[in-house]
């Protein structure tokens, strides 16, 4: 890939697209653009075009070009010949090109991840590097593997990396290798329960998670998630309102805490592991609060927190360096 001193970092998820112009020295973000045109929506648009399969890559590349043009306008200069590094769902069966998963174990430095390079063309003047996902016996991920390889100050010994989200990941690391991971549908369950179930009328999103009452409700939900059966305790979100125990906004945070607590129950016995959480600010605050309660109840270690946006950029930069070797 051409070494321009910069690269375009593309994090293309199922429901979101984020593009950043990154200076390689110091990994400084120079400009950025984002849209809700995730892979799922882009794939739907592609299917409507009814074009031959061999045109799919070019169609997706045109969508990237629209966002590159916004970066060009922000910076006042051409982005031609600056490489594009893509992680996320672009390598899935609804993405630009389907790439196989890398079977675990894989190295934390990302040197054995599966990646595919595409040379610049007349119509898309950027070398492209697409990073594929990883798979275990029962689980898969696309995108999180790049965050894992971008973790700073990697703990020594055995440790667990938690990546919160729609489908949270708990990743086990031994001797510099990812050896196992599990998927927890925490975010998706919250979405379903709060919008599609009988609980929907009992929930109202609060504007301030740091509000004293909201935080108290969240912590109570965490304890309930750790200590009780989820299939029973989730119904309490309804009786919280029927019996005037919580407001609808407080109940929103109670239910969120309940599901996070249920997810993290898996970790109550892992006292010998260091724990790293990689997420956005809201996720880090929520999971930090949950682990403080876990520490009180089960002596689970307090985790180290790392920003997911920075981890993505570091992981993509390392992938680009590995590709040059």
Regions found by a protein language model. Give the residues of each.
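Glycine-rich phosphate-binding/hydrolytic loop that grips phosphoryl groups
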Residues: 265, 302-325
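Short glycine-rich, Thr/Ser-proximal phosphate-binding strand/loop in the N-terminal lobe
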Residues: 7, 14-55
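A short acidic Gly-Thr/Ser loop motif
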Residues: 10-16, 89, 162-167, 186, ...
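Adenine-nucleotide phosphate-binding core of ATP-dependent small-molecule kinases
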Residues: 223-266
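Glycine-rich phosphate-binding loops at beta-strand->alpha-helix junctions
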Residues: 16, 273-291, 309
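Short glycine-rich phosphate-binding loop at a beta-alpha junction
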Residues: 78-90, 165, 260, 272-281
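Short beta-strand-loop/turn "lid" adjacent to the catalytic site in phosphate-handling enzymes
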Residues: 48-53, 69-115, 129-137
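Glycine-rich phosphate-binding loop plus the immediately following alpha-helix
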Residues: 38-52, 132-223
């Amino acid at each position: 890939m051409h070494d321009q001193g910069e690269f375009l970092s593309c994090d293309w998820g199922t429901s979101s697209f984020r593009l950043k112009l990154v200076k390689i020295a110091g990994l400084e973000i120079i400009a950025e653009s984002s849209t809700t045109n995730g892979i799922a929506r882009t794939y739907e648009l592609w299917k409507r075009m009814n074009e031959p399969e061999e045109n799919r890559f070019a169609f997706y590349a045109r969508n990237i070009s629209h966002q590159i043009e916004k970066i060009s306008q922000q910076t006042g200069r051409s982005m031609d010949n600056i490489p594009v590094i893509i992680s996320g769902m672009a390598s899935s069966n609804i993405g630009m090109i389907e790439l196989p998963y890398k079977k675990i174990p894989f190295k934390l430095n990302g040197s054995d991840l599966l990646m595919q390079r595409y040379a610049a063309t007349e119509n898309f003047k950027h070398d492209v590097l697409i990073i594929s996902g990883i798979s275990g016996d029962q689980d898969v991920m696309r995108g999180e593997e790049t965050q894992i390889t971008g973790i700073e100050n990697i703990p020594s010994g055995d440790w667990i990396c938690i990546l919160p989200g729609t489908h949270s990941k708990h990743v086990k690391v031994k001797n510099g290798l990812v050896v196992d991971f599990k998927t927890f549908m925490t975010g998706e369950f919250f979405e379903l329960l709060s919008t599609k179930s009988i609980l929907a009328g009992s929930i109202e999103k609060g504007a301030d998670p740091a509000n004293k009452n909201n935080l108290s409700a969240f912590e109570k939900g965490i304890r309930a998630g750790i200590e009780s059966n989820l299939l029973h305790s989730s119904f309490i979100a309804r009786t919280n309102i029927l019996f005037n125990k919580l407001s609808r906004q407080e109940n929103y945070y109670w239910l969120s805490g309940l599901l996070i607590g249920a997810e993290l129950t898996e970790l109550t016995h892992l006292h010998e592991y260091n724990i790293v959480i990689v997420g956005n600010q809201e996720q880090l605050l929520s999971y930090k609060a949950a682990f403080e309660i876990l520490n009180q109840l089960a002596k689970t270690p307090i985790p180290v927190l790392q920003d997911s946006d920075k981890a993505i950029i570091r992981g993509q930069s390392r992938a680009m360096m590995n590709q040059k070797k």
